[in-house]
Design a protein with these regions (language model features):
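Conserved N-terminal catalytic core of the sugar/cofactor nucleotidyltransferase
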Residues: 35-97, 178-183
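Residue-level signal for inorganic ion chemistry
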Residues: 8, 34, 91, 104, ...
């Protein structure tokens, strides 16, 4: 029997929002952005949720998110770090499940279908990430804007979250990365969990189908887009 844990990351500062309220706590249709993904995990077959937030926001999350919305599956609210990988590492310390889904709390439009595909994909392949094929032609350019080349679009995916793994594998990968950083290796440019697996394990990471609506709320316009998608889904 698999035990499934979700880590929801909500420790970002949201500087691109140009708003005093952090993006994960801004409201969409009367509820904070972070609530939407927590609620989806709450009603899914996930067994426990670890919420990772800024140290200064722990009490707020406990009172205004967990207690206010009666979220029973949240096992703990823990402090994140200054970088995403530090927040994930802190969250992994609290995981008791053998499968873990790591999700950006700034992606409020996750749904149960995505969660199920993530779980089943991890059971079959040990490591998987949610994504969607790119629709546009993508080009690489140099610092001055001159085109270097045009990658084959059929091989390109937009990477989303959750990113899901057998817990022992991702813990091992993060441990190895932390050791490298402590040695002073500053050449690492890690932007998501799949990259940690790619860099520090021999396991292949597989894509599972996501949803083009599974956007990350980063700018003020994204709040409007998320509201529109929620309204359309309600019809």
């Amino acid at each position: 029997m698999n035990k499934i844990t979700a880590i929801v990351l909500a420790a970002g500062s949201g500087s691109r929002m140009k708003n005093k309220t952090k993006k994960q706590f801004m409201e969409i249709k009367g509820k904070p952005v972070i609530w939407y993904s927590l609620f989806e995990f709450e009603k899914s077959r996930v067994d426990e949720i670890i919420l990772v937030t800024g140290k200064e926001d722990i009490d707020y999350c406990k009172k205004e998110i967990v207690e206010k919305y009666n979220l029973k599956k949240i096992k703990n609210v823990v402090a994140g770090g200054s970088e995403r990988y530090e927040s994930v590492y802190n969250g992994l310390k609290e995981v008791t499940g053998n499968i873990v889904l790591i999700h950006d709390g700034a992606r409020p439009l996750i749904n149960n279908e995505i969660i199920e595909r993530s779980i089943e994909g991890t059971i079959k392949s040990d490591a998987c990430v949610v994504g969607v094929p790119v629709k546009d032609t993508i080009k690489r350019a140099d610092k001055e804007g001159y085109i270097i080349d045009t990658p084959n679009r059929s091989e390109l995916w937009i990477t989303q979250t959750p990113q899901s793994f057998k817990t022992d594998l991702v813990k091992m990968a993060y441990k190895k990365m932390k050791e490298e950083l402590e040695k002073g290796n500053t050449t690492l440019n890690i932007t998501d969990d799949a990259m940690v697996m790619e860099e520090f394990t021999t396991n292949q990471v597989r894509f599972v189908q996501g949803d083009y609506k599974n956007i990350k709320v980063t700018t003020p316009e994204d709040i409007d887009i998320a509201e529109l998608f929620i309204e359309l889904d309600a019809k």
